[in-house]
Structure formats: structure tokens, C-alpha cells
Amino acid sequence: MDLKGKKVTLHDMSLRDGMHAKQHQISLDEMVSIATGLDQAGIPLIEVTHGDGLGGSSLNYGFPAHTDEEYLSAVVPKMTQAKVSALLIPGIGTVDHLKMAYDHGVSTIRVATHCTEADVSEQHISAARKMGLDTVGFLMMAHMISPEELLAQAKLMESYGANCIYCTDSAGYMLPDDVSTRIALLRSELNSETEIGFHGHHNLGMSIPNSLAAIEMGANRIDGSVAGLGAGAGNTPLEVFTAVLDRMAVNHGIDLYKIMDVAEDLVMPMMDQPIRIDRNSLTLGYAGVYSSFLLFAERAEKKYGVPARDILLELGRLKTVGGQEDMIDDTAMTMAKALKAAKA
């Protein structure tokens, strides 16, 4: 693989996807400290919201330590070169949330839908483009449909005004060939000025190989997270990925030592538990389950006595998707009843 001379934009997720691993409990001081460190390390894009995006604060998804407005108000004014992005999932976030983010200085909005539901993004993408925002169509759980079906959904988002389309491996299920076929098709069939991005999770240990495959096939925006802080086994660990890109002579603009120090000195000390591939996060990738389901399944194990990995495997069989967090408890309860009946 020869990537020498290619240029990529790295986008940090530790303060948004990392919210899942922290049960949305990141303090304002932690948020500002990490964002400032990322800014000084040269990270050009930093995502800041509730783990489930703007408006995510709810009983279903979890209540954060602070509101999106408070996080954005604290972070945006401190940035010297980095731009701040926000995630918005239609049905959770609204156009009013989008306007709030714009008013608070967000430069990039990423409108995220399940990979088959791009049509629900039209209002939000159109509104973002009218505001002059860098507007990304973010197709989640992209492993669940064929490359051709993904392209059709991407074309919808592009037609609404998205200037960048993401292939999103929300479950950490994909292997490099899965990424290559999808990214190659998107690159060849979307408008040449439309950027292509990839968002990976490390549940099968494939986040770096998958991200490299995406770059090889034409993606120029790659998501990652310092120290991998994110849902499941985390996102592509940015400090590791930066070192790999250095080795491959890819242009990325990040100071390796500084990003290593942010990971080691700021992010790792605030982790509630190590971000690693354990039996439960591995099951997420193996079964193709939405990565943010991990902590929900582990809580259900304590509540119902059913192993989390068995719950996750069943959720994979049921083809659950993001937004169906309520099914985790229902599934665990049903499995517990079946186990009890089998023992009777």
C-alpha cells in the first residue's frame, strides 16, 4: 500500500463519541483541557456534543454533566486553529438545535442517519447548507447494506447539499475489503468535489487497517479519538494512527509528540475503565452491533443475570440499530425469562 503524499484531515471524536465511554459525564474543565491540547497538537476538527449528538440529553440516551450549549460555549472561544463540529441525528436533534450550534460557533455539522434512512436528513442538511456550514452526511451502520445501496443513500444526502459523505462503521464490524469496496464506489460515483470520510471503531482491532484502506480508495477525512476514547472498544486511536501516517509519509499536519501527550496526560487519566477489546466489545464487532450499546448491555447483565455478550449476540441477530436502546432491556428480560423457564 503506497499512500505517500496523500493528504488527510483528521477529525477527533474523543469529546463526542468518548461521551459514551464516560456515560456523558465529562466536566467543562476536562472538555476545555482536552480540546485545547488537541488544538495545540494541530487537530483541525474537534467534535463536541452529547454522545448521541445535539439534543441527545434524555432518559433514553443519558443525561450529560452539562448541556451542549455549555460545552460549546466553553470550547469554541478557546480554539486558535481547530474548528468545532457537532453531530446531529434527525429525530433526536432538530433544526433549532442546529441553529443553536451555529450561533455558538460550530463550523461543521454532521447529519447522521441509519444507512437506509438518508431521506430523513433533507431538512437538516438543507438548513445547514443555507447557514454556510461545512455539511456532512454521516451514514451509520454502513456494514448492514451493500456498497450499491450505500451509494444510493449517499447520493440522496449529496443531492440535499452535503459536501462530504461518511461511510460509518458504527459497529466496528468491517474488514478492510468491506471498507475498500464501499469507499471506492462512493469516490467513483459521487461528484468529484464531494469529500469522502470514514469513521471506524476498534471492536475487531481493524480501525487502523480500515482507515488506511479508506485513504487508499480516496477518503480524505478520517475520524479517530485520542487514546481511542469512544463507544465499544473505542475509535481509531489518533496518536497511534498519526504515527502510522508518519511512517507512510501521509500529510496530516499533526504534532505526534503533542497528540501522544494529550492521550497519555489528559485522556487516559479520566477514563472510567480502560478502552480495550474485551469479550463484550469484541462481541459488538463480531455480531455487528451499534458500539454505544456496550454499557447498556453491561447494565442489563447486572439487572437480569444474562451475560452481556449473549445479549449483544442476540441484538445482532435481531439487526438492531442505533436509536433502539430500549430493546436492550427488553431483549435481556426475554432471555432471562427463557433461561428461567428452561431450568424449571
Curated annotation (Swiss-Prot):
GO molecular function terms attached to this record: 2-isopropylmalate synthase activity; 4-hydroxy-2-oxovalerate aldolase activity; manganese ion binding
Active site per database record: 20
The keyword Calcium appears for this protein: no
Keyword Metal-binding set for record: yes
Domain of life of the native organism: Bacteria
Catalytic reactions of this protein: (S)-4-hydroxy-2-oxopentanoate = acetaldehyde + pyruvate
Positions annotated to bind Mn(2+): 17, 199, 201
Entry's EC annotation: 4.1.3.39
Swiss-Prot/TrEMBL keywords: Aromatic hydrocarbons catabolism, Lyase, Manganese, Metal-binding
Enzyme class: lyase
Residues involved in substrate binding: 16-17, 170, 199, 290
Swiss-Prot/TrEMBL site (Transition state stabilizer) positions: 16
Pyruvate carboxyltransferase domain ranges (all copies): 8-260
One Gene Ontology term from the biological process aspect of the record: catabolic process
PANTHER family per the UniProt record, alphabetical: 2-ISOPROPYLMALATE SYNTHASE 1, CHLOROPLASTIC-RELATED (PTHR10277:SF9), HOMOCITRATE SYNTHASE-RELATED (PTHR10277)
Family according to the record: Belongs to the 4-hydroxy-2-oxovalerate aldolase family.
NCBIfam families assigned to the protein according to its UniProt record, in alphabetical order: 4OH_2_O_val_ald (TIGR03217), PRK08195.1 (NF006049)
Name of the protein: 4-hydroxy-2-oxovalerate aldolase
Provenance organism: Pseudoalteromonas translucida (strain TAC 125)
